[in-house]
Amino acid sequence: MSKAVIVIPARYGSSRLPGKPLLDIVGKPMIQHVYERALQVAGVAEVWVATDDPRVEQAVQAFGGKAIMTRNDHESGTDRLVEVMHKVEADIYINLQGDEPMIRPRDVETLLQGMRDDPALPVATLCHAISAAEAAEPSTVKVVVNTRQDALYFSRSPIPYPRNAEKARYLKHVGIYAYRRDVLQNYSQLPESMPEQAESLEQLRLMNAGINIRTFEVAATGPGVDTPACLEKVRALMAQELAENA
């Protein structure tokens, strides 16, 4: 069986939430919640936190996790993952966002199984259905797919354009990726494309190079932590979840 690892990029610096990976959520740093959920994903050999700050490294080691130091000049999580790829041997690398403490392990398992079911598949990601109102938000990245669930395009604009609104169905892109090793080996050689620069979406670099990205649709996911308001919402939801499971 192909070896799969989960890598959780965790930058300390954040303009809206400084020290974001270490923010407390129901008694644990956020990065610990993500790590513990990643450990629950079946079929994964290792889980690593990739960070650029010793404070995050120390926090991860304090709760018994594995952390790896990376450069602080990476432009994206994928660039950070490429550095990790040179240090951690695997066939499949799953890039799990460090600000998604409510990630469902079964969704990541769906992603991994899709990669294992089709050895020719280079990249995979997740999506879920959303309303037209949510699709109108530029902060929500949308994806249009074909009948095989392969991505045709990602955009911050509402796609497909609702010329016939009754027929439109919107899918939100969930920023979790699975990559084959060879894709990451070649990633740094791929030029930035005009769509990537215009939309500020790194996955468009892969699409511009003709690399297929398959999507797997899941149920609506929990909120990520992007702003102070998001943080308070996640704290409330996870406190409720903790109380229900007590």
From Swiss-Prot:
Keywords: Cytoplasm, Lipopolysaccharide biosynthesis, Nucleotidyltransferase, Transferase. The keyword Transferase applies. The gene is kpsU. The keyword Nucleotidyltransferase applies. GO terms for biological process: CMP-keto-3-deoxy-D-manno-octulosonic acid biosynthetic process; lipopolysaccharide biosynthetic process. GO terms for molecular function: 3-deoxy-manno-octulosonate cytidylyltransferase activity. Belongs to the KdsB family. It comes from the Bacteria. This is 3-deoxy-manno-octulosonate cytidylyltransferase. Its main location: cytoplasm. Activates KDO (a required 8-carbon sugar) for incorporation into bacterial lipopolysaccharide in Gram-negative bacteria. One of its GO terms (cellular component) is cytosol. It catalyses: 3-deoxy-alpha-D-manno-oct-2-ulosonate + CTP = CMP-3-deoxy-beta-D-manno-octulosonate + diphosphate. Homodimer. Pathway: Nucleotide-sugar biosynthesis; CMP-3-deoxy-D-manno-octulosonate biosynthesis; CMP-3-deoxy-D-manno-octulosonate from 3-deoxy-D-manno-octulosonate and CTP: step 1/1; Bacterial outer membrane biogenesis; lipopolysaccharide biosynthesis. Its EC number is 2.7.7.38. It is found in: Cytoplasm.
